[in-house]
Amino acid sequence: MSKRDYYEVLGVGRDTSEREIKKAYKRLAMKFHPDRNPGDKAAEASFKEIKEAYEILTDSDKKAAYDQFGHAGVDPNRGGHGGGQGDFGDIFGDVFGDIFGGGRRGGGQRQAARGSDLRYNLELSLEEAVRGLTKELRIPTLAACDLCDGSGAKKGTSATTCGTCHGQGQVQMRQGFFAVQQACPTCHGRGKIIKDPCGKCHGEGRVEKSKTLSVKIPAGVDTGDRIRLTGEGEAGEFGAPPGDLYVQVSVREHAIFTRDANNLYCEVPISFSKAALGGEIEVPTLDGKVSLKIPTETQTGRMFRLRGKGVKSVRSHAVGDLLCKVVMETPVNLNEKQKELLREFEATLTGESKKHSPKAEGFFDGVKKFFQDLNS
């Protein structure tokens, strides 16, 4: 009788993530578990089929072999464990191990995998990024099962040596002239079999869980900075070390300031009269308002530097500056008296535009010369 497609057994697609495959397995395993279906041979057969499919599709090597060769690529009956095939494994293990510098691993047991690293995207306001703070983060992860202490075996039981690979975690497959080693499909490369799996983690040794961490964000962080929290990633397989958590920082746009490295920039509107006559204006900083002296005859677009009013570097602790660009605003909603005063002022400039507006005079001289050259 031909076997069903493993992806069909679990009801997943070929591009489904490992986490989703695990979710599908747990859902089906709970449904067809023999403890929930006592005496039901069909349910027992389905449970075995589901477990077999899960073991293949969550092992990267076996999954790759299955995707390429189908059931033939993961069927241990197509290989062997005795006779001269062990010699082939020794020969090729020695030769290729010496060539590639890895040393011969032979039939050594596969080590339980380290936990996966996790990434958390953290968005901060500019004020939070500049000043630093402590954030409470809720992290979905895989944690060691507290019922079986991460062993995967039912409480009071333990794993037994795999009869297929005899505890080695690897078997040999014959492919023509070559004998190739691969992870044992029976024990998933561990060298041990869990006959009585834990009812909580279903033999995985890990369960999905959310945990809350207090993370200190240093002052001066910026978009693209990454904070590493060692050991706060997913739990490792069956007691292996956990992964790490990486907090990826991004800073929201600010209504007033823009940031470039450790410097801050802002635009400050000033009136026509203030630009012409000079005076003091108030400008915003992250520490509050400060006074800025505007010289007489200040042109729009002029930049003023306030030293030490920028951001303290998270690495060197040097402090940047605040650069204020003044922008002269044209007055609006004028009454008749104000308009008349401006007309009188404009009249006093007649014939003296070069004296009072040197940039404009230079501009119009350039335009005049342009058309003269164009028509010559």
Swiss-Prot record:
Subcellular location: Cytoplasm
Keywords on record: Chaperone, Cytoplasm, DNA replication, Metal-binding, Repeat, Stress response, Zinc, Zinc-finger
Domain J: 5-70
Single GO molecular function: heat shock protein binding
PROSITE patterns, per the entry: DNAJ_1, DNAJ_2, ZF_CR
ZnF (CR-type) residues: 132-210
GO annotation terms (biological process): chaperone cofactor-dependent protein refolding; DNA replication; protein refolding; response to heat
Cofactor(s) recorded in Swiss-Prot or TrEMBL: Zn(2+)
Residues bound to Zn(2+) 2: 162, 165, 184, 187
CXXCXGXG motif repeat segments: 145-152, 162-169, 184-191, 198-205
Record: residues binding Zn(2+) 1: 145, 148, 198, 201
Any one of the GO CC terms: cytoplasm
Cofactor note: Binds 2 Zn(2+) ions per monomer.
Family: Belongs to the DnaJ family.
Subunit structure: Homodimer.
PANTHER family for this protein: CHAPERONE PROTEIN DNAJ, DNAJ HOMOLOG 1, MITOCHONDRIAL-RELATED
Role this protein plays: Participates actively in the response to hyperosmotic and heat shock by preventing the aggregation of stress-denatured proteins and by disaggregating proteins, also in an autonomous, DnaK-independent fashion. Unfolded proteins bind initially to DnaJ; upon interaction with the DnaJ-bound protein, DnaK hydrolyzes its bound ATP, resulting in the formation of a stable complex. GrpE releases ADP from DnaK; ATP binding to DnaK triggers the release of the substrate protein, thus completing the reaction cycle.
Comment, domains: The J domain is necessary and sufficient to stimulate DnaK ATPase activity. Zinc center 1 plays an important role in the autonomous, DnaK-independent chaperone activity of DnaJ. Zinc center 2 is essential for interaction with DnaK and for DnaJ activity.
Protein name: Chaperone protein DnaJ
